[in-house]
Amino acid sequence: MQNNRHGTFSSSSIHILTQLNKAKTDFSEKAQKYIKQVGYELELGRPLNAERDSRPTSWGTFVETRAFNLLPIEYQLVSQTRLFHPEISTWSGAPDLIIEFIDFINEIEGIEVVSDVKCPFSLEVFLDKVKALNESVEAYKKEFPADYWQLVSNAVLTGAKYAEAIIYGPYVSE
């Protein structure tokens, strides 16, 4: 079993598979290309393209830690752990945070909440995400389908009861 992202449909890109062609009879061209790329990665045993570090990605990674440090102690940072679907080996994800539950009476435990922290580089995007999320889940799904489907995918992979988007933008003073 592999421990890396290549050769899998990842939670962060799973939204591509929700797109249909104009006739709504098949996957969109973009989805078909994604499926082909994952197939190539499986054949090659490596990623097709080298992952590039961009300024917005570096910002998000840096600020995500700050956001985590502001959250209650129940949250566990798990973003370095890649999870795989138990039946679909080509489906994986790496959620940012989880909150576990333990029911001592019934002797069961699991994941209550799975969370993804979004720290947009742009304040405009930050405000757009907050506005959409405050409006409704459907508005967030419509405006930010990649974020929405990433949460859904990670909820399935973890078995979490709830999925939570945490949108964070530091103050200038921070």
Q: At which residue positions do the language-model features occur?
A:
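Nucleic-acid nuclease catalytic cores
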Residues: 74-95, 99-174
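Charged, glycine-rich intrinsically disordered N-terminal tails and low-complexity linkers that flank
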Residues: 1-62, 70, 132-141
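Nucleic-acid endo/exonuclease domains
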Residues: 48-81, 85-86, 147-148
